[in-house]
Amino acid sequence: MITLFRIDFRLLHFQTAQVWPQKTGANEIVVANDSVAKDALRISLMKMSAPHGCKLKIIPVAEAITYLNSEASKERKIELLVETTHDALRIAEAVEGITALNAALMKGGEGKKMVSPSLAFAPEDFENFRKILAKGIRVESYVAPDDRPVPIEKYL
């Protein structure tokens, strides 16, 4: 069962490794990212950040989809972390039962529009969020558990 599905360009860091699992009761963190799954240094750093008593998987998106659709995942309380709306959409389209997505931190850069202090959208992000919303998934932006959620529609 997915307890938190979050877009965060930093993926695993203090808040996602320590604060969120306590808030959601997650006993497993799945980092779904194709490039990180091949990067031994980043994997090593993330493993050092993982909370005690919480299983950590760092796997490509396709493998995450397979796992999230398996019976084994149904027995876990999973915090699912992705870096981009593209990866979030891939998962939203392929995994049943997702009801919510937290758009927390999306990095700025050339060609991106800052829509809030923590969110910068590339043109494709607007469309990806619309597709996720069309699946009936609630998408809200908040960084910390006690922040007030802002519906993503405000920024589209």
Task: Specify the residue positions occupied by each region the protein language model found.
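Ordered, amphipathic secondary-structure segments that act as subunit-interaction surfaces
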Residues: 58-104
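Short, ordered loop/turn segments at secondary-structure junctions
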Residues: 9, 33-36, 60-64, 85-86, ...
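Long, hydrophobic N-terminal alpha-helical segment
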Residues: 1-55
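Glycine-rich, aromatic-bearing surface loops/beta-hairpins
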Residues: 94, 99-156
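C-terminal catalytic "cap/lid" subdomain
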Residues: 13, 33-34, 69, 78-81, ...
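General beta-strand structural signal in soluble alpha/beta enzymes
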Residues: 5-7, 31, 57-60, 80, ...
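Short basic, glycine-rich beta-strand/loop surfaces that mediate nucleic-acid
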Residues: 7, 49, 53-57, 67-81, ...
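Short coil/turn connectors at secondary-structure junctions
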Residues: 1-2, 24-27, 54, 74-77, ...
